[in-house]
Amino acid sequence: MTNIRKTHPLIKIVNHSFIDLPTPSNISAWWNFGSLLGLCLIIQILTGLFLAMHYTSDTMTAFSSVTHICRDVNYGWLIRYIHANGASMFFICLYLHVGRGLYYGSYTYFETWNIGVILLFTIMATAFMGYVLPWGQMSFWGATVITNLLSAIPYIGTNLVEWIWGGFSVDKATLTRFFAFHFILPFIIAALVMVHLLFFHETGSNNPSGLISDSDKVPFHPYFTIKDILGALLLTLSLMLLVLFSPDLLGDPDNYTPANPLNTPPHIKPEWYFLFAYAILRSIPNKLGGVLALVFSILILMLFPILHMSKQRGMMFRPLSQCLFWILAADLFTLTWIGGQPVEHPFIIIGQTASILYFTIILIILPLASMLENKLLKW
């Protein structure tokens, strides 16, 4: 009798995705982040579901409902902090996953890569709306500032902003719809993840060498299931260390003050994982220009397959490109730091320089370096 996992219509899909999947034998720990992102999504959906049972999306009671969750609900504080810091873990894994894709040339799988970029946008939108829900000072002003950016769109901008707000300012209608979207989007993300995996399993996994690995593949289970479980344990450990020892480390103290439209916080800034994009936005004095730079700073990822000039896939054997990649990584750290600083000298000029460097490396220097490497190898 044939094994049920190979014949049953439903179990067969799971088998081909997680058990008998042919996997390159040399993939490193950088390939762990896909499964860790799946784990993060599950954690966020489960904790979010329990938070939604006690949360009220009304401007009068939203802040106190979060307080109620932390004080009166059994382990409510734990669920709330796992959800808040789980988002940070999600973005750490996300950025490392994207970085791995850039370094090893995984973007040559067009469909998988483009779905991935769409996923990144969707997750960013979800995280932004989630940050608004506790209705603290930074929630309110963050929502006001970021939604206001849409008013830079010519002709329809103002109408669009008022339509999103559901009125003439960020108020009850805005909070209610943000809660509705924040609830539904993770399920849309889960569906997109399925599509991401579908395209990914069409081509199979890339590997650190960038070479075709058909002759050297092993079954996913038990080799990589064990490896993924180790990654999951390390992720859970680091998340729980963060949650139980310093849950507010990555948050903003201003968000413990209830939202007040009459009192603007001295420094309005988003969560740490958006600071690099926020720094790029602020580095351009023109409003529309800033918004375009902000969108393009993420959308630029879709251009990588077009900008790939090298005859080798990854950067494993390309020292010049490796060097530029790490300069780009350092530049993103600089932008993240600048995004959290006040708009004054010398931070303005540092932010502008880092923003120009970011786009220049990706659009000009990396493709030129790739062509030079081809030349040096007489290809």
Swiss-Prot record:
Ligand binding (heme b b562): 83, 182
Compartments reported by the entry: Mitochondrion inner membrane
MF (Gene Ontology): metal ion binding; ubiquinol-cytochrome-c reductase activity
Listed GO CC annotations: mitochondrial inner membrane; respiratory chain complex III
Chief location of this protein within or outside the cell: mitochondrion
Chain sites annotated for binding a ubiquinone: 201
Keywords on record: Electron transport, Heme, Iron, Membrane, Metal-binding, Mitochondrion, Mitochondrion inner membrane, Respiratory chain, Transmembrane, Transmembrane helix, Transport, Ubiquinone
TM stretches of this protein: 33-53, 77-98, 113-133, 178-198, 226-246, 288-308, 320-340, 347-367
Cofactor remark: Binds 2 heme b groups non-covalently.
InterPro entries per the UniProt record, alphabetical: Cyt_b/b6_C (IPR005798), Cyt_b/b6_C_sf (IPR036150), Cyt_b/b6_N (IPR005797), Cytb/b6-like_sf (IPR027387), Cytochrome_b (IPR030689), Cytochrome_b_C_euk/bac (IPR048260), Cytochrome_b_N_euk/bac (IPR048259), Di-haem_cyt_TM (IPR016174)
Top-level taxonomic group: Eukaryota
Membrane topology value: Multi-pass membrane protein
BP term (GO), one: mitochondrial electron transport, ubiquinol to cytochrome c
Requisite cofactors: heme b
Binding site residues for heme b b566: 97, 196
Pfam family, one: Cytochrom_B_C
Record text on subunit structure and interactions: The cytochrome bc1 complex contains 11 subunits: 3 respiratory subunits (MT-CYB, CYC1 and UQCRFS1), 2 core proteins (UQCRC1 and UQCRC2) and 6 low-molecular weight proteins (UQCRH/QCR6, UQCRB/QCR7, UQCRQ/QCR8, UQCR10/QCR9, UQCR11/QCR10 and a cleavage product of UQCRFS1). This cytochrome bc1 complex then forms a dimer.
Classification via PANTHER family: CYTOCHROME B
Role noted for this protein: Component of the ubiquinol-cytochrome c reductase complex (complex III or cytochrome b-c1 complex) that is part of the mitochondrial respiratory chain. The b-c1 complex mediates electron transfer from ubiquinol to cytochrome c. Contributes to the generation of a proton gradient across the mitochondrial membrane that is then used for ATP synthesis.
Family: Belongs to the cytochrome b family.
Note: Heme 1 (or BL or b562) is low-potential and absorbs at about 562 nm, and heme 2 (or BH or b566) is high-potential and absorbs at about 566 nm.
The protein, known as: Cytochrome b
Organism: Petaurista hainana (Hainan giant flying squirrel)
Protein's gene: MT-CYB
